[in-house]
């Protein structure tokens, strides 16, 4: 079987699962015409959008998802209000949540717009980080997964990864 590697722009409101017993919209709805089974690399919560990788190579998908590889993921976040400079400093130092300290790789903020890079994949990590500091995330978009970029790929569309992109991962 030929190995397939896909970059998909997950729209807001879609579950990061290949099927849902309750019939809610999910990733599998976009790939139901494919014969091979696809595995998603990591997850984005239902309210988040952006780049998610899929493959019929289960071992690769599991490897890319494993925290030990510390793959950096970059996000664009829109907050309900401007990020205070003291909170920006706190995020750079590390913020304690109930399941441990969150350390970011990089962060830039301009008013309500925040660009954040993180290699952790804990559940709702960016939303929980911002909520711990008193902010509400209005939009969360994953723009990069390692060296793979979302670019201009429209929501709900997908493309194959190039051999160059796969090598760089």
Where are these regions (language model features)?
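Basic, flexible Lys/Arg- and Gly-enriched helix-loop patches that mediate nucleic-acid binding at interfaces
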Residues: 1-169
């Amino acid at each position: 079987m030929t190995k397939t590697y896909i970059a998909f722009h997950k729209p807001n409101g879609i579950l990061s699962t290949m099927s849902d017993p309750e019939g809610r919209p999910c990733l599998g709805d976009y790939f139901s015409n494919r014969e091979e089974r696809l595995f998603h690399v990591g997850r984005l919560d239902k309210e988040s959008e952006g780049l998610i990788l899929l493959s019929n190579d289960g071992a690769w998908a599991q490897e890319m998802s494993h925290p030990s590889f510390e793959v950096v993921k970059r996000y664009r976040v829109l907050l309900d209000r401007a990020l205070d400079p003291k909170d920006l400093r706190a995020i750079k130092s590390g913020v304690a949540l109930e399941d441990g300290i969150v350390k970011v790789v990089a962060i830039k903020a301009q008013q309500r717009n925040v660009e954040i890079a993180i290699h952790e994949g804990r559940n709702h990590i960016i939303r929980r980080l911002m909520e711990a500091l008193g902010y509400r995330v209005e939009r969360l978009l994953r723009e990069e997964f390692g060296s793979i970029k979302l670019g201009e790929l429209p929501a709900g569309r997908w493309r194959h990864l190039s051999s160059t992109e796969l090598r760089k991962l």
